From Swiss-Prot:
One cellular component term from this protein's GO annotations in UniProt: cytochrome b6f complex
Record-annotated membrane-spanning stretches: 4-24
Name of protein: Cytochrome b6-f complex subunit 6
Keyword Transmembrane helix: yes
Known partners and oligomeric status: The 4 large subunits of the cytochrome b6-f complex are cytochrome b6, subunit IV (17 kDa polypeptide, PetD), cytochrome f and the Rieske protein, while the 4 small subunits are PetG, PetL, PetM and PetN. The complex functions as a dimer.
Originating organism: Stigeoclonium helveticum (Green alga)
Length: 32
């Protein structure tokens, strides 16, 4: 059970980081 929860946390964290980087790149492109 703990492994499933920790895996989900890692998955959500990775998705959040990807979204933040993607949005940051979009804003950077718009600024240029």
């Amino acid at each position: 059970m703990l492994t499933i929860i920790s895996y989900l946390v890692l998955l959500v964290g990775a998705l959040t980081v990807t979204l933040v980087i993607y949005l940051g790149l979009l804003k950077g492109v718009k600024l240029i």
